[in-house]
Amino acid sequence: MYIGIAHYLTVSAIMFTVGIFGIFLNRKNVIIILMSIELILLSVNLNFVAFSAFLHDLVGQIFALFILTVAAAEAAIGLAILVVFFRNRGSIAVEDVNVMKG
């Protein structure tokens, strides 16, 4: 069975939609919002890799590696900020993040 580019784009669109719904439907938990953003970035990476393989060009795959690197750094920094915020406030609810001073 041949898996064409349409299959990859369908899976990527589903992943992107789930990520968008995760952001808009769950506004109380910051960790789930970060996970939804990561899911959106992974769906974009899947698009880059699928088109790169379809067009026989490595630029999309190299760009996807750069996006993965930036996404890993973003997740690490975001989680570190959340850990410090939890130690100071005792909660990581979005309502508590909105009352930050500075």
UniProtKB/Swiss-Prot annotation:
Record localization: Cell inner membrane
InterPro entries per UniProt: NADH_UbQ_OxRdtase_chain4L/K, NUOK/Mnh_C1-like
Annotated keywords: Cell inner membrane, Cell membrane, Membrane, NAD, Quinone, Translocase, Transmembrane, Transmembrane helix, Transport, Ubiquinone
GO molecular function: NADH:ubiquinone reductase (non-electrogenic) activity; quinone binding
Keyword Protein biosynthesis attributed: no
Gene this chain is encoded by: nuoK
Annotated TM spans: 5-25, 31-51, 66-86
Keyword Translocase among record annotations: yes
Function statement: NDH-1 shuttles electrons from NADH, via FMN and iron-sulfur (Fe-S) centers, to quinones in the respiratory chain. The immediate electron acceptor for the enzyme in this species is believed to be ubiquinone. Couples the redox reaction to proton translocation (for every two electrons transferred, four hydrogen ions are translocated across the cytoplasmic membrane), and thus conserves the redox energy in a proton gradient.
Record's protein name: NADH-quinone oxidoreductase subunit K
Annotated Pfam families: Oxidored_q2 (PF00420)
EC numbers for this chain: 7.1.1.-
First-level EC class: translocase
GO cellular component: NADH dehydrogenase complex; plasma membrane
Protein's GO biological process: ATP synthesis coupled electron transport
PANTHER family in the record: NADH DEHYDROGENASE SUBUNIT 4L-RELATED, NADH-UBIQUINONE OXIDOREDUCTASE SUBUNIT ND4L
Known partners and oligomeric status: NDH-1 is composed of 14 different subunits. Subunits NuoA, H, J, K, L, M, N constitute the membrane sector of the complex.
Reaction catalysis annotation: a quinone + NADH + 5 H(+)(in) = a quinol + NAD(+) + 4 H(+)(out)
Annotated family: Belongs to the complex I subunit 4L family.
Topology class, membrane: Multi-pass membrane protein
